[in-house]
Amino acid sequence: MFVPFLIMLREGLEAALIVSLIASYLKRTQRGMXDCVMWIGVLLAAALCLGLGIFINETTGEFPQKEQELFEGIVAVIAVVILTWMVFWMRKVSRNVKVQLEQAVDSALQRGNHHGWALVMMVFFAVAREGLESVFFLLAAFQQDVGIWPPLGAMLGLATAVVLGFLLYWGGIRLNLGAFFKWTSLFILFVAAGLAAGAIRAFHEAGLWNHFQEIAFDMSAVLSTHSLFGTLMEGIFGYQEAPSVSEVAVWFIYLIPALVAFALPPRAGATASRSA
């Protein structure tokens, strides 16, 4: 439940910040009449992401066992790529993003009689990107942790992000977004490492990967996945009490370079947003 909550909170907050920046700029430049056009783009993006998620989730249940394992492995790999890109993209986000959004709004509103649709599409693509990232991650997370709690966590995370987005827009709160994105990014790298190990396990069960399947270690006597804490660790980080050598290797092969890259200072001119 916690991982879907955190991911949807983060992704939802990113989308909320984009919408908030656009809405604030429209209001500041006395073009508030375009607000309804902006919300059309937001709703279209939300409908696309929701529809795609439901379609994929419903159709995969009809796959034979091996094909389903293969699909789960592919989704996990896509989720790892998306999460990693999301973490390092955010590190490169600077205050120029606000300027770029404002320039994009100006450009969209200056395209003659069709400026309304131009703004709709601009907002649509900006929000849909965040939503599509969430779709693939949630598909991987729901496969790793079944039951009602992961979807509930995702909905709570999204609802929290929406509330925070409105409060930020109205000026009711100020958040240290730099610290928020920094610590959630670090957490997400560990989640992605667990997904990477889970992808190898899924590919093995699909019959595609049969190398290094010896048990690396057995922690069942110390931290069983049948215990409360073990279940939480499995749901959050993909913990396995008796992982194979290939799962452990993939976990380290992904995580160590990712942590090193994350610890390095961002390139000059690319500083993360501090607050809003």
UniProtKB/Swiss-Prot annotation:
Spans within the Cytoplasmic topological domain: 23-35, 91-118, 169-179, 266-276
Main location class: membrane
Name of the coding gene: efeU
Biological process terms in GO annotation: iron ion transmembrane transport
Subcellular location: Cell inner membrane
Annotated membrane topology: Multi-pass membrane protein
Subunit structure comment from the entry: Part of a ferrous iron transporter composed of EfeU, EfeO and EfeB. However, this EfeUOB tripartite iron transporter is defective in E.coli strain K12 due to a frameshift mutation in EfeU.
Organism per entry: Escherichia coli (strain K12)
Ranges that cross the membrane: 2-22, 36-56, 70-90, 119-139, 148-168, 180-200, 245-265
InterPro entries referenced in this protein's UniProt entry, alphabetically: EfeU/FTR1-like, FTR1/Fip1/EfeU
Keywords: Cell inner membrane, Cell membrane, Membrane, Transmembrane, Transmembrane helix
GO MF: ferrous iron transmembrane transporter activity
Name of this protein: Putative inactive ferrous iron permease EfeU
One Gene Ontology cellular component: plasma membrane
Family, similarity comment: Belongs to the oxidase-dependent Fe transporter (OFeT) (TC 9.A.10.1) family.
Sequence ranges on the Periplasmic membrane side: 1, 57-69, 140-147, 201-244
Pfam family name, one: FTR1
